[in-house]
């Protein structure tokens, strides 16, 4: 199982969630181990996804992974953000082994999105006072990536079992 970053940036949507759940259940039915290669920036936003049942389909993915009795190995290749990462074979969902590339990013939210939320007041003040907002945003993004969005932190807190060098 893998995300395809060349198609919709690898996000999970209604159709891909259905496909993931079906594939994991198929592997479990035939006693085949599930190897998940993760590069997922999140779920596809939008009211069309909500009306199509993204919550229900996402729950199918959770159910498929959580109930699978076969060995499950997950490798984070690049991005692993939010609930989409959790359902894609994370430790929280019951994977047996989780690994990551050293350059991978594992967090609730990507650095740029998090900075825009966390530092919105500072960025607004900087804009009002005529400061270089882009430089300040870049500084905050760098700090957030160093402190939060890195695989080393995930290794330290036990979200992954090891790094692939």
Give residue spans per PLM region.
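Ligand-binding clefts of soluble mixed alpha/beta catalytic domains
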Residues: 1-165
């Amino acid at each position: 199982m893998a995300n395809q970053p060349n198609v919709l940036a690898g996000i999970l949507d209604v159709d891909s969630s259905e496909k993931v759940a079906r594939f994991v259940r198929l592997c479990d039915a035939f006693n085949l181990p599930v190897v998940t290669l993760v590069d997922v920036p999140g779920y596809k936003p939008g009211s069309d996804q909500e009306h199509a049942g993204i919550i229900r389909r996402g729950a199918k993915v959770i159910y498929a992974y959580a109930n699978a009795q076969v060995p499950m190995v997950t490798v984070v290749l690049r991005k692993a953000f939010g609930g989409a990462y959790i359902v894609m074979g994370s430790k929280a969902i019951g994977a047996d082994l989780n690994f990551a590339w050293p350059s991978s990013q594992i967090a609730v939210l990507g650095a740029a999105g998090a900075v825009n939320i966390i530092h919105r007041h500072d960025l607004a003040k900087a804009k009002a006072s005529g400061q270089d907002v882009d430089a300040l945003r870049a500084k905050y993004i760098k700090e957030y990536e160093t402190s939060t969005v890195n695989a080393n932190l995930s290794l330290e807190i036990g979200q992954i079992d090891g790094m692939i060098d």
